[in-house]
């Protein structure tokens, strides 16, 4: 009997950025793998810093399917929100294909709703709101599709530890070792509820001391700054435009229109997906939820309002 096989897909969060061990990264997925099987699980981490949903679908998924994993984690989408090419309909289509592919193989899929970068960076509202709106859209898609495919879903965006600064690395975008351990612990508990994993959960306390203040500042001034520039270089002009739109609607008292449009886009994105159930066994109707809420419920499609002159 072969050991349990776990494959991790995603971006820098799953790659382990923020949890340095030796000359590389460890991260929550590696910590979780240690509690999935005895003596050990076969763990493959395909996550790459900067990956978007397209990268997961076109590059990481084929490699993962060849391994025929028992468990696969798919945490991705934040980088999509940081690009000018953001398209919630395409994101929904890609994630639907990824989740369905694993479900057809009988793989248990792990997913998560994540906080938006603007909130974690403490951006002012006119800059942070557009990013928050995008991340809520991604989270709504992830949550709805997770319900559809029976994924092991972590609604991390509302967890109290998210706002604990001690859980985050110096860049405020990636968890530190404590934060990575919290993610691993929560996934381990949910997997145990489904009969997967050992009784020994990943430790909550860090194994290594946190980086010194000087080391953190050095990282931010070198690798951290380069990381932000690489992720956001094509978004900055658009973010300025989005901020201008935000300010105009705020001045007119019509900010809610932006939320309505975002919700409408999510509704259309999910409605465009096939209603055929996983593996073709039954039909399902995808319904959206109010963006950012964990409960699954029907959500009447909002009607667009005309743009104010």
Model-derived features: positions:
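Alpha-helical scaffolding segments of alpha/beta enzyme cores, especially the outer helices
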Residues: 31, 90-93, 97-104, 137-144
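Conserved catalytic region of serine esterases and O-acyltransferases that act on ester linkages
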Residues: 148, 171-174, 178-309
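Short amphipathic alpha-helices and their capping/turn segments at secondary-structure boundaries
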Residues: 1-2, 57-68, 94-104
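Substrate-gating cap/lid alpha-helix
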Residues: 121-155, 177
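Serine-esterase "nucleophile elbow" of acetyl-processing enzymes
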Residues: 1-49, 61-68, 273-276, 280-282, ...
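A short helix->loop->beta-strand "cap" motif at the edges of active sites that frequently abuts
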Residues: 104-108, 151
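Oxyanion-hole/transition-state-stabilizing segment in secreted/luminal serine hydrolases
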Residues: 15-19, 53-90, 116-117
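Alpha-helix N-cap and loop-to-helix initiation/capping positions
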Residues: 23-24, 86-93, 126-134, 171, ...
């Amino acid at each position: 009997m072969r050991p349990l096989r776990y494959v991790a897909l995603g971006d820098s969060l799953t790659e382990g950025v923020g949890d340095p061990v030796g000359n590389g990264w460890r991260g929550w997925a590696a910590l979780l793998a240690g509690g999935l099987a005895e003596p050990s699980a076969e763990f493959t981490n395909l996550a790459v810093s900067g990956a978007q949903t397209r990268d997961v679908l076109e590059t990481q998924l084929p490699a993962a399917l060849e391994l025929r994993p028992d468990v696969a984690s798919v945490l991705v989408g934040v980088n999509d929100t940081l690009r000018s090419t953001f398209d919630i309909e395409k994101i929904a289509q890609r994630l639907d294909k990824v989740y369905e592919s694993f479900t057809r193989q009988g793989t248990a899929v792990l997913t998560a709703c994540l906080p938006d970068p603007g909130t974690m960076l403490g951006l002012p509202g006119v800059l942070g709101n557009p990013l928050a709106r995008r991340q809520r859209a991604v989270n709504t898609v992830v949550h709805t599709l997770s319900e559809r495919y029976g994924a092991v879903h972590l609604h991390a965006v509302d967890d109290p530890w998210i706002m604990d600064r001690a859980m985050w690395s110096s860049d405020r975008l990636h968890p530190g070792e404590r934060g990575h351990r919290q993610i691993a612990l929560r996934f381990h508990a949910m997997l145990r509820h489904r009969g997967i994993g050992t009784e020994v959960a990943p430790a909550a306390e860090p194994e290594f001391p946190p980086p010194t203040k000087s080391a953190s500042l050095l990282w931010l001034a070198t690798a951290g700054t380069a990381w932000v520039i690489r992720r956001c270089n094509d978004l900055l002009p658009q973010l300025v435009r989005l901020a201008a739109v935000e300010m105009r609607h705020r001045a007119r008292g019509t900010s809610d229109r932006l939320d309505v449009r975002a919700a409408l886009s999510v509704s259309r994105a999910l409605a465009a997906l096939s209603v055929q159930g996983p593996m073709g066994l039954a039909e399902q109707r995808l319904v959206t939820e109010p963006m950012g809420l964990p409960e699954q419920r029907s959500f009447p499609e909002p009607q667009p309002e005309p743009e104010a002159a």
